[in-house]
């Protein structure tokens, strides 16, 4: 919309539209504009004038490409708010209330904040302001239809600044029709500067109440009630990883996310590969989306109403993949613009809406992300549970912290006084104005909501662990019950019974002594990948896909390929439910496996990620849904039908083809070419050749697109014939557990022989030394990915002395082993050179 300067003529017919304004008369058809600024005339330099939210919208509307749509509208300046207080002489009385009230007293805070809001809400607006609001609304209506529906949003002058989000503190009004209703909404927005939550937040952040003013933004409503809407972050909200665009969405209006009422869909897009032209969604998580917020009829008492979402829409994503990619590109463009303007990287928090009638995607808000952006990236804090206990229930983790204490069930805001210091606040959902009670809590659990709702954002800012989407929490947990809330394991948060001790370790990565040998990490859970990737490691030495198959896919791949062969009708029904929304069972398997592997590969991009193809034993395969119809019972599965032998056997070769297709999709289609594929438990040279042939037939040809294929060196034949295996593969990874088992003839699962299972036995060490030397003879790398180097410093030192190329460790062992190895290597250099003795110390 063009900026309208100066005076605007008003005709007699427009008086009805504008309403009854005392200063407006037929003989004076001109109204001077003082308080209105059209959005596309604003920039970020106008924050003191129109607040952070409105200035940001103006920046988007006026400075970015036409690909980014911003709904037309105008801002009512912060001067209008200040003049309202001054013209009604409100501030002296308000200041007295603000000064004399104990804002930590919940009852007094609620009473006095309501009193402050009432003072503003009942004060008459300046007649000039009233007229200008109506006139601007008329102009907007002329462009888009009589009595156009508008969104009315507060925009504080201290809002959306680094370290200050003000998330959800001030009022928003949707689907506002008519000039009179708009004027009332503006008045309520001004009053919302003094909600209990807003007052408390300003006190905590050190803002003087008089220094913060409120502007109001008015925009044409996007008909997201007929489509979808949501939130975008240009980083991973839990780890702060900046290679990710995270998009959440629900059907209908975005308030369902903001209020934590609906469990949203969540989509991840990888920035570096998208920039290279790989337009693929990294990961889809489909939320339940059981309810949606839609516009009510114009005659209704409330402007919006909640509706149930049908089952078919609950399981369907609220955005198509091409729309997800389009939003990701827009978010990246916005981030780039703000970063260039600010002269520093500026991750963004963005709200989007899809218009039902025209299908277009709009950006309705954009602001700097305020939680991770200000943090020192060189500091790494790890939270570790030092014990265990029975898991009561699970949900989505917000943050990575751990908290424990007695449960305090809260039905609504009237019960917040019950929440004491150190309590675990449990509710169906929370709202941002619960912040004073949230501050007293050691953790929060809700039955609904997603990781981008306002309550989650505020909880991150407060440093409180939160679990959202924990179904039945208010039924399963009782007030006074002691529990531990664990968010340290990735996206899945756990509520455990009892008080379980935990430890916190913070290290400055820049000051760590680094080992000369590459340290890598073992990982299985994609949900933990972005957090683990913050460790100072050279990459992933072992990515186990068994976790993805067990927890994400859940079904035996052959059962997905041949569901008609499943004898149990109940299992057939479960598999049908799992695969609904996918083209076929094979499409389900390939998609879910590819997304899990891709998440790990993206987290560590461009570092190498060695992905081992499935290495379940037959009894483990049988435990998957439908598995018993495709697996034979074995007396000793540990050395039975596992690893490479399965891949070329008629009973499993079609399933292995699906694994290959998933890995090919990750590397070639999604652009994550840092994935190295590794074959486990390959007994014979002929078997290796047949496996490589099968891989090539399914898109994984060694050397194509830089593909490297490694082999696990975990069978004596791998060491004895290492010169032959070296001709077929690009690298080796020693599996010390299986190698020890097979060299010593000790069943690694046998309790009675546990004392004889010894990785540092001379026979095992001799095999490891031969393997390293054999790989190096052919110019190939040889690493190790067993547990022993984590537990035994002497063994790790011995490996380094044998010039092992890499040691892959569990994430919680990395920093300790790194520092021990660095000290050892430094000490070794200061001593005369000698061969290290084998030690189990």
Annotate each PLM feature.
Residues 145, 149-151, 156-166, 170-174, ...:
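Conserved alpha/beta-domain cores
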Residues 244-347, 354, 396-400, 421, ...:
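Conserved catalytic alpha/beta cores of large enzymes that bind or transform nucleotide phosphates
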Residues 168, 343-370:
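Conserved metal-phosphate-binding beta-hairpin within the catalytic cores
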Residues 26-217, 226, 314-322, 326-327, ...:
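N-terminal beta-alpha lobe that positions the nucleotide/phosphoryl donor
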Residues 23, 87, 91, 357, ...:
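Acidic, glycine-rich flexible loop/linker segments
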Residues 15-29:
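Short, Lys/Arg-enriched N-terminal segments with co-localized hydrophobic residues
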Residues 166-200, 224-298, 363-394, 440-447, ...:
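Extended active-site and interfacial segments that coordinate phosphate-rich ligands
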């Amino acid at each position: 919309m063009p900026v309208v300067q100066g005076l605007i003529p008003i005709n007699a017919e427009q008086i009805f539209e504008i309403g009854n304004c005392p200063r407006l008369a037929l003989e004076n058809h001109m109204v001077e504009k003082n308080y209105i600024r059209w959005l596309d005339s604003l920039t970020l330099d106008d924050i003191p004038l129109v607040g952070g939210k409105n200035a940001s919208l103006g920046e988007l509307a006026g400075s970015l490409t036409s690909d980014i749509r911003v709904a037309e509208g105008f801002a009512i300046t912060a001067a209008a708010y200040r003049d309202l207080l001054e013209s009604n002489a409100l501030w002296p009385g308000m200041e007295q209330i603000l000064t004399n009230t104990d804002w930590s007293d919940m009852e007094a805070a609620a009473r006095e904040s309501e009193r402050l809001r009432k003072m503003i809400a009942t004060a008459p607006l300046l007649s000039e302001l009233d007229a200008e609001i109506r006139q601007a609304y008329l102009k907007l209506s002329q462009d888009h239809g009589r009595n156009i529906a508008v969104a009315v949003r507060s925009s504080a002058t201290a809002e959306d600044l680094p370290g200050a989000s003000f998330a959800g503190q001030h009022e928003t009004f949707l689907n506002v029709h008519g000039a009179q209703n708009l004027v009332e909404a503006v008045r309520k927005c001004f009053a919302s500067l003094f909600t209990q939550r807003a007052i408390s937040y300003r006190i905590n952040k050190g803002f003087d109440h008089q220094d913060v003013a409120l502007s109001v933004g008015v925009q044409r409503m996007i008909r997201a009630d007929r489509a979808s809407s949501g939130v975008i972050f240009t980083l991973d909200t839990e780890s702060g990883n900046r290679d990710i665009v995270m998009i959440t969405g629900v059907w209908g209006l975005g308030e369902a996310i903001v209020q934590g009422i609906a469990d949203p869909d969540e989509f991840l897009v990888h920035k570096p590969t998208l920039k290279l032209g790989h337009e693929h969604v990294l990961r889809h998580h489909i939320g339940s989306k059981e309810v949606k917020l839609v516009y009510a009829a114009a005659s209704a008492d409330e402007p919006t109403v909640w509706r149930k979402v049908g089952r078919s829409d609950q399981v369907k994503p609220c955005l198509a993949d091409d729309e997800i990619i389009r939003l990701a590109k827009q978010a990246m463009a916005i981030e780039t613009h703000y970063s260039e303007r600010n002269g520093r990287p500026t991750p963004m928090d963005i709200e989007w809406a899809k218009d039902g009638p025209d299908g277009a995607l709009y950006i309705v808000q954009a602001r700097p992300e305020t939680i991770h952006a200000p943090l020192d990236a060189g500091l790494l804090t790890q939270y570790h549970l030092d014990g265990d206990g029975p898991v009561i229930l699970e949900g989505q983790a917000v943050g990575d912290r751990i908290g424990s204490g007695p449960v305090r069930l809260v039905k609504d805001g009237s019960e917040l006084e019950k929440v004491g210091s150190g309590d675990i606040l449990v509710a169906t959902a929370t709202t941002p104005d619960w912040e004073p009670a949230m501050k007293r809590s050691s953790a929060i659990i809700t039955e609904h909501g997603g990781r981008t709702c306002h309550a989650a954002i505020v909880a991150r800012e407060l440093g409180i662990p939160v679990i959202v989407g924990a179904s039945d929490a208010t039924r399963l947990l009782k007030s006074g019950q002691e529990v531990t809330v664990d968010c340290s394991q990735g996206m899945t948060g756990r509520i455990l019974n009892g008080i379980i001790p935990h430890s916190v370790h913070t290290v400055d990565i820049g000051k760590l002594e680094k080992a000369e040998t590459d340290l890598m990490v073992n990982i299985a859970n994609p949900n933990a990948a972005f957090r683990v990737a913050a460790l100072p490691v050279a990459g992933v030495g072992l990515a186990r896909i068994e976790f993805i198959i067990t927890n994400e896919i859940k079904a035996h791949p052959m059962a997905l390929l041949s569901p008609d062969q499943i004898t149990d009708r109940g299992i057939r029904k479960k598999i049908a439910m799992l695969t609904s929304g996918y083209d076929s069972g094979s499409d389900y398997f390939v998609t879910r496996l590819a997304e899990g592997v891709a998440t790990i590969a993206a987290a560590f991009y461009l570092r190498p990620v060695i992905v081992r193809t499935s290495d379940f034993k037959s009894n483990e395969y049988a435990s998957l849904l439908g598995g018993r119809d495709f697996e034979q019972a074995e007396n000793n599965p540990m050395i039975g039908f596992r690893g490479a032998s399965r891949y070329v056997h008629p009973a499993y070769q079609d399933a292995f083809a699906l694994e290959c297709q998933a890995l090919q999709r990750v590397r070639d289609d999604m652009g994550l070419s840092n994935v190295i594929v590794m074959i486990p438990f390959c007994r014979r040279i002929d078997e290796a050749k047949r496996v490589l042939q099968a891989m090539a037939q399914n898109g994984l040809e060694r050397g194509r697109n830089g593909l490297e294929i490694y082999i696990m060196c975990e069978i004596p034949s791998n060491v004895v014939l290492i010169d032959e295996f070296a001709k077929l593969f690009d690298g080796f990874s020693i599996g010390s557990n299986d190698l020890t088992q097979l060299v010593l003839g000790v069943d690694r699962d046998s309790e009675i022989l546990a004392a004889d299972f010894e990785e540092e036995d001379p026979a095992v060490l001799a095999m490891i030394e031969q393997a390293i030397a054999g790989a190096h003879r052919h110019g190939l790398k040889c690493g190790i990915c067993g547990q022993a180097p984590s537990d035994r410093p002497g063994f790790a030192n011995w490996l380094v002395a044998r010039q092992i190329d890499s040691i892959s460790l569990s994430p919680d062992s990395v920093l300790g082993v790194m520092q021990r190895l660095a000290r050892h290597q430094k000490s070794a250099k200061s001593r005369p050179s000698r061969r290290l003795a084998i030690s189990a110390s």
